[in-house]
């Protein structure tokens, strides 16, 4: 990549070349430089840009906002090796859901910093966790409890309860977690009878939480179950408040809004003076991954249609609208639209005058599937074949689930970081014990 005026030198992180800039720059600036070089070279392939500096900024924000809560990054959200290495260097733990995810991070951190947070595991995966030294794992049924006992000699168990935000982007309570009132007490008693080591309670209010008050409800249930567990002789030293934290702050939801509920609830229900041995962790994914990544695509066709075809308003039949076809779609980077209920919103990479006409547009991916629509109805300037579209905030549940359906390759990723942030990460990594 040629980024004249942007990149001063390169460093290798996780075996990958990362551009280092002496001054801080943003994703769009880097994407513009890459696109310009590609256009000159006749390369119109889509590409991804990851700003490693953004990852550290999110870590700092978390530590300032919820200092008592230690984040364990949800690997499922984005398993990019530069992202994982950066988070590990910054002292992060990891939430893993499978054997493969454990394998991705076991060389980065010690097994004590891994939570196997999948309440339904195969016997082989449980045995693998034992071999890898991973003890902390979740369960939500007597069947899973029995399975773990039969396949792991020394597990540290975390009971997952179901407390869900009904407005969350992705509902998880319908699949995982037991009822905190009717089932959870029975499972704690059963675990105690079986001589199993239950160390705490976990919950997940739903990926993409919109109602932070749900955290308070879940913490109240957790407090009651902690008390029961302690009365049964269980150690109860871990509280896992799950994920659901926003990747980008909006008028409706922010990390501050979540913290405004969580921090006082922890102080009231799990005060440090009476609960000094209770470790509080969380499982954020999109919070760390989303804003660091952008996707830039190329318009491969621009087709004029009656605007009514897009807006579905009969009055727009005589207005112009456009269907933009681009070379990445829902089978690639934009699978988040189908699987994560995310609504990507793109913009022209090139600047357009404010008084330039805007038109109703829909944006299609490149495959033959009619389902491959990234934006149903948006408003954009007139774009032409060969123009570039820029999509910010695309790091969560995107590349990790991308496919090569119809023979379309996954986009290449470019990485950059500013020099000051790189120095901070290196110093942090050098001062921390390596797992």
Curated annotation (Swiss-Prot):
Pathway: Amine and polyamine biosynthesis; putrescine biosynthesis via L-ornithine pathway; putrescine from L-ornithine: step 1/1. Inhibited by antizyme (AZ) in response to polyamine levels. AZ inhibits the assembly of the functional homodimer by binding to ODC monomers and targeting them for ubiquitin-independent proteolytic destruction by the 26S proteasome. It is an enzyme of class 4 (lyase). The modification N6-(pyridoxal phosphate)lysine is found at residue 76. Pfam families: Orn_Arg_deC_N, Orn_DAP_Arg_deC. Its cofactor is pyridoxal 5'-phosphate. It catalyses: L-ornithine + H(+) = putrescine + CO2. The keyword Membrane does not apply. Its EC number is 4.1.1.17. The record marks 204 as: Stacks against the aromatic ring of pyridoxal phosphate and stabilizes reaction intermediates. GO terms for cellular component: cytoplasm. Pyridoxal 5'-phosphate binds at residues 207, 244, 283-286, 397. One of its GO terms (biological process) is putrescine biosynthetic process from arginine, via ornithine. Keywords: Decarboxylase, Lyase, Polyamine biosynthesis, Pyridoxal phosphate. Substrate binds at residues 339-340, 369. One of its GO terms (molecular function) is ornithine decarboxylase activity. Belongs to the Orn/Lys/Arg decarboxylase class-II family. PANTHER family: ARGININE/DIAMINOPIMELATE/ORNITHINE DECARBOXYLASE (PTHR11482), ORNITHINE DECARBOXYLASE 1-RELATED (PTHR11482:SF6). Homodimer. Only the dimer is catalytically active, as the active sites are constructed of residues from both monomers. Catalyzes the first and rate-limiting step of polyamine biosynthesis that converts ornithine into putrescine, which is the precursor for the polyamines, spermidine and spermine. Polyamines are essential for cell proliferation and are implicated in cellular processes, ranging from DNA replication to apoptosis. This is Ornithine decarboxylase. It comes from Panagrellus redivivus (Microworm).
């Amino acid at each position: 990549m040629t980024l004249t005026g942007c990149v001063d030198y390169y460093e290798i992180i996780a075996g990958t070349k990362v551009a280092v800039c002496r001054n801080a720059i943003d994703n769009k600036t880097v994407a513009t430089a890459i696109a310009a070089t590609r256009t000159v070279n006749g390369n119109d392939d889509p590409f991804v840009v990851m700003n490693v500096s953004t990852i550290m900024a999110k870590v700092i924000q978390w530590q300032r906002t919820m200092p008592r809560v230690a984040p364990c990054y949800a690997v499922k959200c984005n398993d990019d090796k530069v992202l994982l290495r950066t988070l590990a260097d910054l002292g992060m733990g990891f939430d893993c859901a499978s054997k493969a995810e454990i394998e991705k991070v076991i060389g980065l951190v010690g097994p004590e910093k891994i939570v196997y947070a999948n309440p339904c595991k195969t016997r082989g995966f449980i045995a693998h966790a034992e071999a890898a030294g991973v003890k902390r794992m979740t369960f939500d049924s007597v069947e899973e409890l029995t399975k773990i006992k039969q396949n792991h000699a020394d597990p540290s168990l975390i009971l997952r309860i179901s407390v869900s935000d009904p407005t969350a982007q992705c509902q998880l309570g319908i699949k995982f977690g037991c009822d905190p009132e009717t089932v959870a007490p029975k499972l704690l008693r059963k675990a105690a009878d079986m001589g199993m080591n239950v160390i705490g309670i976990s919950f997940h209010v739903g990926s993409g939480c919109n109602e932070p008050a749900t955290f308070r409800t879940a913490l109240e249930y957790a407090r009651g179950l902690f008390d029961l567990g302690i009365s049964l002789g269980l150690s109860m030293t871990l509280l896992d408040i799950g994920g659901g934290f926003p990747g980008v702050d909006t008028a409706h939801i922010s990390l501050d809004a979540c913290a405004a509920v969580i921090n006082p609830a922890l102080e009231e229900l799990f005060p440090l003076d009476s609960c000094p041995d209770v470790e509080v962790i969380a499982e954020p994914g999109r919070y760390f991954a989303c804003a660091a990544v952008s996707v830039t695509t190329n318009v491969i066709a621009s087709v004029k249609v009656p605007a009514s075809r897009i807006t579905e308003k009969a009055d727009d039949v005589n207005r112009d609208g456009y269907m933009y076809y681009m070379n990445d779609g829902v089978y690639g980077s934009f699978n988040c639209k189908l699987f994560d209920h995310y609504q990507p919103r793109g913009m022209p990479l090139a600047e357009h005058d404010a008084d330039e006409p805007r038109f109703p547009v829909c944006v299609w991916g490149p495959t033959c599937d009619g389902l491959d629509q990234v934006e149903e109805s948006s408003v954009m300037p007139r774009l032409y074949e060969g123009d570039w579209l820029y999509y910010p905030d695309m790091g969560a549940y995107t590349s990790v689930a991308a496919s090569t359906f119809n023979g379309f390759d996954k986009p290449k990723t470019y990485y950059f970081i500013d020099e000051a942030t790189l120095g901070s990460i290196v110093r942090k990594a050098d001062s921390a014990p390596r797992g």
